[in-house]
Amino acid sequence: MKKLFLFIAALSMSEIAMAQYCSIDGFTTPELRLASYQRSQAATSFNISCDTGYSILFNSQNLVSSNGISYVSNGPNKLRTKLNLSGANSGLWGVRVNQGASQRQKYIVSVQLEENPFNGVPAGTYRDRISVDINF
């Protein structure tokens, strides 16, 4: 009976010790750079592998709406952009979405400059920050 008890204790401890994991890899580029003309585009992609279900949230520092309307800014000046998502996500920005376990689920993030930068906007460096938050 003592041996059986030790075996059960060891078995239950091994289940506790199994860690869940998620990893991100395969970034095509860490930075999205738009050219200085209307409708210019940039994109990146990456893969997520999780051995358990996870939730994912795509966000932008300057996000205006969940359909991806955002802007780049140099402080006082703004240029409107459109952010797009493809992958297992619903395509919504600023909305946490639950996903099932997967191996190498590919996500693509793209941005398009919606406004003409030559229409009265001063030259400068215009920025936005995109973040991806994963909970598992």
Where are the regions that the model predicts?
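Absolute protein N-terminus
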Residues: M1-K3, A19-Q20
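Sec-dependent N-terminal signal peptides
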Residues: K3-M13
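Short, flexible beta-strand-to-coil junctions
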Residues: S12, Q61-V64, G75-P76, S86
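N-terminal small/polar-rich segments of proteins
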Residues: M18-S73, R96-F136
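Mid-chain, well-packed structural core segment of small domains
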Residues: N77-Q103, Y107
